[in-house]
């Protein structure tokens, strides 16, 4: 919320299992609750196709009062869902469908835009990366447990989504930071990058918050084999 208040974007890069989805749902719910009547709080969540309905299930479970819609169906049905999205509604779609439906979003302004598994836009030259950056949104947040998998250009692409120009053009970033840091092991270049991005990245590992996590509960459940599965020799 501090980043949003100051008109910055950010990366939530917590380790897997620390509840990034729930943190975002809580943030969206607070935005809806604290906004003035008639104020645009429309939100867009973009996620891998395999996680679309997981997002919907989590919203229904933890914030049942949060209006949310999965953009699904054929082209005509999806366009209707997008066109009729209210100013206090969360739309959930996949990267692939966003790319296909991009024109339908041109007349919508979003208060919040979330990209889950942000490594999907690590290659800034792909259509998917270009599509998410064309959405008009006031605040942008990226979720990923791996902000950098192989190259620093992946981090640049995510920040180009969050705050275009913050890490310069890619040509300047590559010349002044990426090449010196990677090819020539220039510690000054890496420190410069870390100093620039530190205020906008929240990353916690499980070991960092282990003392705050509840005890792990284990329960053994036995399921007998059915007759077709069980054969005596």
Positions of predicted regions on the chain:
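ASCE P-loop NTPase motor core, strongest for the SF2 helicase catalytic module
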Residues: 1-185, 192-233
């Amino acid at each position: 919320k501090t980043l949003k208040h100051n008109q910055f974007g950010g990366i939530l890069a917590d380790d897997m299992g620390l509840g990034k989805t729930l943190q975002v749902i809580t943030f969206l719910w607070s935005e809806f609750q604290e906004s003035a009547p008639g104020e645009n709080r429309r939100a867009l969540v973009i996620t891998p196709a395999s996680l679309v309905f997981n997002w919907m299930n989590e919203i229904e479970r933890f914030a049942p009062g949060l209006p949310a819609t999965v953009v699904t169906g054929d082209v005509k049905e999806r366009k209707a869902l997008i066109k009729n999205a209210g100013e206090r509604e969360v739309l959930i779609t996949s990267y692939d469908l966003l790319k296909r439906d991009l024109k339908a979003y041109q007349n919508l302004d979003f208060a919040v835009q979330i990209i889950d598994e942000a490594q999907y836009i690590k290659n800034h030259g792909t259509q998917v990366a270009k599509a998410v950056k064309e959405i008009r949104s006031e605040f942008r947040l990226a979720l990923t447990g791996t902000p950098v998998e192989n190259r620093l250009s992946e981090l640049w692409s995510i920040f180009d989504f969050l705050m275009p120009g913050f890490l310069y053009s890619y040509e300047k970033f590559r010349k002044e930071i990426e090449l010196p840091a990677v090819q020539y092991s220039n510690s000054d270049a890496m420190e410069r990058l870390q100093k620039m991005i530190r205020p906008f990245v929240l990353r916690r590992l499980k070991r960092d918050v282990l003392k705050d996590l509840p005890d792990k509960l284990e329960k053994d459940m036995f399921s007998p084999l059915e007759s077709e599965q069980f054969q005596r020799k």
